[in-house]
Amino acid sequence: MPVSWTLLIVLAMAAAGFAIGRSRVLAAAGGDSRRLHSRTSYYGWNIALFTAVPALFLIAIWLFAQPQANRWVLGAAALVLAAMGLFWTLGRTTPQFRARIAVEGFVRGLLIMCSMIAILTTAGIVFSMLFETGHFFRQYPWQEFFFGTTWSPRFGGGSQLGILPLLWGTLYISFIALAVSIPIGLFAAIYMSEYASPRLRGIAKPLIEVLAGIPTIVYGLFALVTVGPALRDYFAQPLGLGSSGSSVMTAGLVMGIMLIPFVSSLSDDIINAVPQSLRDGALGLGSTKSETVRNVVLPAALPGIVGAILLAASRAIGETMIVVLGAGAAARMDLNPFEAMTTITVKIVSQLTGDTDFAAPETLVAFALGLTLFVITLGLNVVALYVVRKYREQYE
């Protein structure tokens, strides 16, 4: 039996159970819904949930564990489980049954299960990286990885896998991107929320948010074809700082443009959420519009603004395509923003692609790089949480 047929039959049984349960309990109460413990819809939902959810859960687990299993056996098992749930719940559907409590408990259990899936998925990702990183450090000294200044993987042996050049490129490009996106995005949000007319805001905000929907590969091509050559011809070559269109500045500027809608849109929503009474109180005490924004609105909106900046920073650190096309693939430590560099994410991709030995340290280093990115992102979250709590306490 095809899985689609099984799903349709299970859902049909649940729908039938919903209708039968409602009519049956209402008939048992003599047509008087006031004699029921719960509303009639709860009795129907109780039957539908206990009929469909266990069977659907069985199908999902079975297909995940045994994708090639016999579909007729799977369908029969799911239908038997659905029928058991249907008849069991019908048997206890009486006017005195606390259907609302049962349904709410069932839904609460589903929510807990979904939360556990998210938590266990995160834990699984972390433990998988830790496991593979452990294999890597058993083959390559951790001192040379964390403090090495040369990145030169050779699958034939003699590799130098120092992370510092990659970390420097990641932070350098991210810094330039944030230096572009944070001021522009934040000032745009302040203008749209505090100074712009509703008509202008309705036009400007969607136009800015269009940038968020552009694929990163398009930004990368924009960096490769337009921004890179322009920076090379008008800045790098005249100043004697380089002759390549691929550079840290190219990737940072284009990435900053990409991050503007993240900072702007989120900050705008947070600033608009500040109660109008705070603005009215500040204006009533004689503050100007700019003083109200600076001393009242922004401190109140600071937690959300920090969250927007954190989101932009995480996106910048994890970006790959713009760096590949805009900054090149050279792993070096240099202060010149017009030199080609690379980032951790680019090297993760390069080390895991191609016909490589998965047990070799040159491949396993990708997991160590990924774990490093995870730790950096976690550190950003901790710092942001500290800043939010500090300023929120001062404001309160």
PLM-predicted stretches and their roles:
Residues 269-272, 276, 283, 310, ...:
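C-terminal transmembrane helix and the adjacent membrane-cytosol boundary/short C-terminal tail
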Residues 238, 323-374:
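Interhelical loop and adjacent transmembrane-helix boundary motif
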Residues 65-77, 90-113, 129-177, 197, ...:
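Periplasmic/extracellular loop-to-transmembrane helix junction in inner-membrane transport proteins
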Residues 206, 210-211, 266, 271, ...:
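Transmembrane alpha-helices
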Residues 178-180, 186-192, 198, 202, ...:
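Membrane-cytosol interface at the C-terminal ends of specific transmembrane alpha-helices
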